[in-house]
Amino acid sequence: MSKDYDHRGIEAAAQADWERTQVYRVTENAVNASGKKKPKYYACSMLPYPSGKLHMGHVRNYTINDVMARQLRMQGYNVLMPMGWDAFGMPAENAAIQNKVPPAKWTYDNIAYMKKQMAAMGLAIDWSREVATCSPDYYRWNQWLFLKMLEKGVAYRKTQVVNWDPIDQTVLANEQVIDGRGWRSGALVEKREIPGYYFNITAYAEQLLSGLDGLGWPERVKTMQQNWIGKSRGVRFAFKHEIADAHGNFIQDGLLYVFTTRADTIMGVTFCAVAAEHPLASKAAENNPTLAAFIEKCKTGSVIEADLATQEKEGMFTGLYVTHPLTNESVPVWVGNYVLMSYGDGAVMGVPAHDERDFAFALKYELPIKQVIALKDESPMFNGTHWQDWYAQKENVVCFNSGKFDGLSHEEAVNTVASDLEKMGIGELKTTYRLRDWGISRQRYWGTPIPIIHCGDEGNPGCGAVPVPEADLPVVLPEDCVPDGSGNPLNKRADFLNVKCPQCGKPARRETDTMDTFVDSSWYFMRYTGPDATSMVDGRNEYWMPMDQYIGGIEHAILHLLYARFWTKVMRDLDLITFDEPFQNLLTQGMVLNETYYSEEASGKKTWLNPLDVELDLDEKGRPQGAKLKGDSSGTPVIIGGVEKMSKSKNNGVDPQALIDQYGADTARLFVMFAAPPEQQLEWSGAGVDGASRFLRRVWMYSSSQASAIKDAQDALPSTLNDAEKELRREVHAILKQANFDYQRRQYNTVVSAAMKMLNVLEPIKLGQDSPISASVLRECLSILLRVLYPVVPHLTHVLWKDMGYSENFGSLLDAPWPTVDETALIQTEITLMLQINGKLRGELKVPADASKEQIEAIALQSEPATKALNGGAPKKVIVVPGRLINIVA
């Protein structure tokens, strides 16, 4: 075999072997060589969007998954590692508009290219289970389950104020609005009333909350979901009024309902605020154009609580009053831009003395501030300059200035207030959730068609919204549409749009809204288990699910992970599956970072420069003092921007394909595993990549130099080992023990460190007549090194394993047994201690491993450095540090 490390030839040969033998194709209920059923292990990365090319975040994610899958398979597990494509969504439509091609063509072309990139990475993917969510064979089951959910009332249609993205021309779920802007377009979100379909995820709020307890997920992710679900215990009650509508009927039966977690502050209410869409606001605006204009202004912007919390609080008095239920005082009603109609009853009570938002609102509009709770054992006098002291805490406050509730603790007051209001028939204790139902209707083309047919029109209601019969599924999306940016192209496709009503047979129209793409990603991992199933899932799903290990970015903590958990529980309730949670364990890999550089124009406009185009000026210690563009003679100033996440916007990404072409996939894999633990951020380093390449070259050159002797050696160890062989095996098996521990902890960076230590131990050994190490012992040690390295660098190790003759006895490296630590090899008969005289190192001392303190002292005192220093005299003191050193004080 060649001693030159040719990564292209090596990786091509390995991949050809894997393709020819289809080694990554797995089946259910696999057995080992002895006929015993293997334990299953399902390890899966979050499926990618086929954007065109892989980025380094993909490389890191999939390499982590691959390392895990390969090592577990060698340990005897039946491992499933599938891959698919989250193929619907707006980017494909935008690309289609820009390139004047159908989104389908753009998507499938990207899938083909990215699949080649994954093959080049050497990933152990079972491609027989590949899924693309834009395939009718897949999304028909989105439609089928939608109809089942419709039957059960889990899916329903309603008109509601929603987040509207004016650029993408579609509704956004709350989770898809970030800082008041659309998560894809970045446009400022508007409020609109629009009909659409919703999933009743709020009915599962308590299950979604309690189910987190048993999951092996990062606490940070659990906390994010807990906060998003937002369980609150409080009191829902009503302020009475006699405000009538145009027909003379009291609006909402004369009751303005609010919910509060701080019913102990009810006596401090000085105003109520309602949402712009509230019936009382509409009534007040009928003859008040100024208020009407303010209401319209409020209807622009996000309907996200987090966004409302940071925007300036604005309001306008309606001229209306409601009656306080306990004091009978008149309470003014205001329209507030911070009140959501979709949250609770669309109204809140205002207690300025004990709520930061209400306090700011009251100061701005000169509303009364009434203190009604006080800190225990302190002066109850409210001071407006120290309002923070009176904000709502629960543990150390009592009611004050609250009549019959004076002196009651928070909990006592809440229960008493709730009881009084319940007796009056206008209040009750209630548990609420911040979580809102999931709106799935999107006014876009490239998505799963919602299987509904609309019969009738405004003049003739007809049959209304009629579900598509199950036999007519899937409702196939025409793939030849080329969007032009002027709305949903499905509205222009008569062949899709026009259909007969399934109930009455009269002309009708298909629903042209498509489903939120998070529907697609809510169950794809189950379809992997049986992509050819004639039902949504089959028995294979019960074998593989729930998933043992899920891997993906923490940015999906709320959106995808919450929806997937909800979807799983719905499928359980429909008796399609028997498990409650989809993902038993979750690993959230850290981001990949790189340096950023930019040039800045006089106007302040920044042009981001790729790090490969920048040359650094370094001082004598290698620290950057400045930067310049390579080959730039004009002296354009280059500013060092610091280390940030790799992104297109900062132009600081590294092309994985270029990296593989130059160094090989094994080098790329080794670097991303060695540079940082999986959960931590990884800072890109060109020097680190070079170092990874040098290490692999050393492995190849050393192994190939010893290959001929090792290939002919026996697998069985000699019956008697010499001291050098014992010491070599002790070192190698000690390193193996640490590597096994690190593999178990998923600390792959220290696994690579262990392999490097092992190579350092082996490299000095050159088999030959003068070598104290036999070929059989080195054969064992090298087999351990190759197996420890294999999950991380599968190409090089696969070829070496084969060329050095290991496969003849152990079979393919993928299915070779994981090396077992020989505990007897770790037993030392002799250890080496540092010998010090008067605290200065004077040599080494070999002593029996089980020697007592007295025996060690005796051996040390007989050593040449000791006898010379003592010159026949006795030592003043002898200090023994077990396992490390002995110090003789002369």
Swiss-Prot record:
Protein's cellular compartments: Cytoplasm
Residues noted as binding ATP in the record, renumbered to the chain: K648
Enzyme class: ligase
GO biological process: leucyl-tRNA aminoacylation
Source organism of this protein record: Polynucleobacter asymbioticus (strain DSM 18221 / CIP 109841 / QLW-P1DMWA-1) (Polynucleobacter necessarius subsp. asymbioticus)
GO CC, any one term: cytosol
Keywords annotated in UniProt: Aminoacyl-tRNA synthetase, ATP-binding, Cytoplasm, Ligase, Nucleotide-binding, Protein biosynthesis
Catalytic activity: tRNA(Leu) + L-leucine + ATP = L-leucyl-tRNA(Leu) + AMP + diphosphate
Coiled-coil annotated spans: none
Assigned protein family: Belongs to the class-I aminoacyl-tRNA synthetase family.
Protein name: Leucine--tRNA ligase
Motif annotated as 'HIGH' region, chain positions: 48-58
